[in-house]
Amino acid sequence: FAGDNLDDELYVRWLQYGVFNPIFRPHAQEGVPSEPVFRSDKAKRLAKSAIAMRYRMLPYNYNLMYQNHAFGKPLMRPLFFEEPNNTDILDYSKAYLWGNDILVSPVLEAEKRAQDIYFPKANVWFDFYTNEKIIGGQTKTVRLNENSIPTYVRAGAFIPLTKPISNTSEYDNSTLELHYYFDTSSPETVRTFYTDNGKDVNSIKNGDYEMMNFIAEYKGSNLKLNLKQIYVLRYTDENTLFPKDKAVDLRVHNIQNAPKSVKVDGKKVNVKWNSETKTLHIPIGWKASETKEIKIKLKR
């Protein structure tokens, strides 16, 4: 943003795009201030929402950095990674994958009300904000709203979020909001997430890190989820950032009816099912090195 470019809408769109970008910051030159505080009240409100979401994405984004470091996987991935034989999308630039499981389509024009997005085939996608289900292998015109840019999650994905925080030092890994996007098209899923104390550059070398393994299996009307800590860091005084116990707010999306029953480690538990969002909320206490098994009996 330079010269007389004071477009608040595009400023906000830039920050919304930055949520799913390796670098999150506003840019400006000459006499244009880059900070949100110098924008309109509406722009400040929308900017605050985007900044808050960036912090909430910390568990997912931190794992992307690990995958990049350990395996060379890019954080931002072109859609032809999904369909390498589809020459029509070799230069497709209207959307990209943020990691393996999130599809993002930036909004680049002001006053735009809709845009066409290609959804990779052989997948089902869910709107990150509304839970709308979209079948892959098609180009779909989606309506835009000012609160966010089009963002979608792959069916079968686990997306870990942290509680609302205002800076990275507040992230302590003691609470986790874990979203699982259920769909019969993806009956088996395995995802692994890396985390450490966020300070020591030698965490992997020193063995001071944690690998969380999330597994989903669906058969008949039975959905089983396992949460495993396949490697737990050494809990020393220096690693107080990582409590041994976690409070997990498990949210299972695309559950069309209230389930017949939900069991955690063989015991029936009370859960909340939202009839509007079709989301099941399951609170779980998770101790270090402990495997949690969640069995959900669905209504057909």
Where are these regions (language model features)?
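Catalytic-domain carbohydrate-binding cleft regions of carbohydrate-active enzymes
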Residues: F1-I149, V153-R154, T195-G198
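Accessory, solvent-exposed terminal regions and/or long lumenal/extracellular loops of proteins
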Residues: V153-K260, V264-K267, N274-T277, P283-E290, ...
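Solvent-exposed beta-strand/loop surfaces of large extracellular or lumenal domains
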Residues: D127-E146, S261-P283
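Preference for bulky hydrophobic residues occupying beta-strand positions
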Residues: P106, I117, L250-V252, I282, ...
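Extracellular interaction modules
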Residues: L144-E146, W286-I294
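Short, surface-exposed charged micro-motifs
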Residues: K94-A95, D116, N213-I215, N270-K272
